[in-house]
Amino acid sequence: MQEVFSYNLYPGPSAKKGVYSILLHIGEQEGWVTLHASTVKIVTPYELELTIMHEGASGGGKSEMTEPFHRQEDGRLLLATDIVSGEEIKVNIADTSTLHPVTDDMALAHPSLQNKSGKLVVADAEYGWFLRVDHIVHYGTDPEVEEATIHPKEPMIFLNEDAVPGSTCLIWDHIEDAPGKPCPNPRVIMPRKVKKNIVNGVGEIDIRSFGIRTPPTTSDKPNYGIIGMFHILPPALAWIWRLVAPRGYANPSIIDNSSSAMAMKSEGVGSYWPFATGKKVDQANLLLEQILNTPETRYILIPNQYIGCYKGGFAGEWATREYLSRRGGLKYKKESLVPSRCSILGYSPKSIKMDGEVIPAGLLQVDKQPRVGQAAYDEGAKMLTDFFKEQLKQFDTPDLLPLGHDIIQAVLNDEDVEKFYDLIPVL
């Protein structure tokens, strides 16, 4: 028997995470995991299908992965804006893909769901979806969610929204924490069935992505915002990122007024540790075994908010989703990849072309941005790797699988990307 106690006045998430804790506890006993992830099946205009599962700490872009991208008035996607000059980089994505959401936040990877494909298979662990809507600041930002909340077919719960009982709640009217300062964490709880094109079965995962919020980074103000639009991770590095699970920059779910508020912090193993019981090393072993048992699933890393000196919000995530689905997946020849200057970032693609438009090289390899340069990049890389080394020490115990010891030791020894590939040679 499991008991769940919801002690605060925010009952939706508190009770939900209590149920998540139960699933993690049962999974730990039986050898499986409920992942902190959204999942979406993408069907391109060319009828190609790709399923992406996006993991990460709160604010890492899970809900955004299942959303249509936000077009400008001219129909293009605003990919990035130079924070110094104001120069905008836009891409034209003429025909958008159809999105079929599978999970929003909790992806059940039960053994009974797995098949012989060599890919991870998941199902939704939730009936209601708990959506953050801080990015919806005016009418027309996300028409699907706006329509569902303005004309609800079933009762919904609105949190941190400026509304009164019996009224129509406009989800871009967020309450204010102070005059002129909107609450960073407005939420809506809605039944999953009100989402369009919802998948009521399982999702067979082609790509597991991991999201991190990154700060602005320039040669004048070096920081860890050195991650390109997306990076390809060898499975060994994908596991490392899930152990450390950085919360990243300006996390809207975390209130921290201390002097260390801007410092990097970890959400804990799997990015679900705040809800787990037991030992971290047991969860680390389960995640490593899961990766080894699903060799046909590939791994990427996606930043949001900033790419070097460019502000992009979640546009890079949406562009990556559209690009990889049109490409038909992630299987790259190694000669088309560049080892990242910071080895825990895996590989970068040498070049990307979307609907005939070339993505600037500096958005793929941040050290190539003139406003960043190699010296500032290396300083940011040291911030990132030092944080990883500090976080990984707690897992290096006798209970960890031998392969896990080898992977962690490679991080501590500053090994190059090829070493991580050799430990689990799949790309």
Summary of predicted features, one role per range:
Residues 78, 83-178:
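Conserved nucleotide-sensing/catalytic segment adjacent to the nucleotide-binding pocket
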Residues 60-63, 73-75, 108-111, 129-132, ...:
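Flexible loop/turn segments at secondary-structure boundaries
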Residues 131-427:
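Conserved NTP phosphate-binding and transfer environment spanning the P-loop NTPase/kinase superfamily
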Residues 31-35, 39-49:
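Phosphate-binding P-loop
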Residues 1-36:
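Charged, amphipathic alpha-helical linker segments immediately N-terminal to NTP-binding catalytic cores
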Residues 2-9, 49-53, 269:
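Glycine- and acidic
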Residues 47-76:
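Glycine-rich phosphate-binding P-loop
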Residues 29, 46, 72-81, 90-96, ...:
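Secondary-structure transition/capping motifs at alpha-helix termini
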